[in-house]
């Protein structure tokens, strides 16, 4: 490491002569607050971990048996088939929407995991997943992935106002969830 060049006696004397009559500026207009550690890093890591955990449910090798005729639909064994009918009629309106347009399969899996995690955290029981038409890759894979997740109670092709056959309405199991009573 190099030493800084020191000023000669002449330069130091000249500097002192030029500074005669000056006074130090008192800086009192800006308050310097001590910098704090960013707290947002810990929740971000936790969210990433939750998304990764949720995406482990989605396998490309496992092919659940779904109805291939008519609209895409699925209901878990312990859930009433009447829930599918209510979804088809539009009795449920989604509170959260997920658009998968333009995503890769890996990104779509991660986003689905994040959606399910967010719904459970916010106690949202109905969400809409818009997979689009495209090359039909996500349109075919999305129902297969959703049927594998243990917190997905049911899904059905969305009504026209929510995307029709390019979207799915998904019922997600949240703690202490009760279906709303119809009038």
UniProtKB/Swiss-Prot annotation:
EC number: 3.1.-.-
Alphabetically ordered keywords of this record: Endonuclease, Hydrolase, Nuclease, RNA-binding, rRNA-binding
Signal peptide: none
Protein name per UniProt: Ribosome rescue factor SmrB
Lineage of producing organism: Bacteria, Pseudomonadati, Pseudomonadota, Gammaproteobacteria, Enterobacterales
Similarity section: Belongs to the SmrB family.
Molecular functions (GO terms): RNA endonuclease activity; rRNA binding
HAMAP family named in the record: SmrB
Boundaries of every Smr domain copy: 98-173
InterPro entries: Smr_dom (IPR002625), Smr_dom_sf (IPR036063), SmrB-like (IPR022990)
Organism: Salmonella arizonae (strain ATCC BAA-731 / CDC346-86 / RSK2980)
């Amino acid at each position: 490491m190099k030493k800084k060049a020191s000023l000669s006696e002449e330069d130091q004397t000249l500097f002192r002569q030029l500074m005669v009559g000056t006074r130090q500026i008192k800086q009192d207009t800006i308050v310097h607050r001590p910098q704090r550690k960013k707290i947002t890093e810990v929740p971000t890591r936790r969210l990433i971990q939750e998304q990764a955990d949720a995406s482990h449910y989605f396998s490309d090798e496992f092919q659940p048996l779904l109805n291939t005729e008519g609209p895409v639909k699925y209901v878990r064994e312990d859930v009433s088939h009447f829930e599918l009918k209510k979804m088809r009629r539009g009795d449920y309106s989604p509170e959260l929407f997920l658009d998968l347009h333009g995503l890769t399969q890996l990104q779509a899996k991660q986003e689905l995991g994040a959606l399910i995690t967010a719904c459970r955290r916010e106690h949202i029981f109905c969400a809409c997943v818009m997979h689009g038409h495209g090359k039909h890759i996500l349109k075919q894979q999305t129902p297969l992935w959703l049927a594998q997740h243990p917190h997905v109670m049911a899904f059905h092709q969305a009504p026209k106002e929510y995307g029709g056959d390019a979207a799915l309405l998904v019922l997600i199991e949240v703690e202490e969830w009760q279906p709303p009573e119809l009038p």
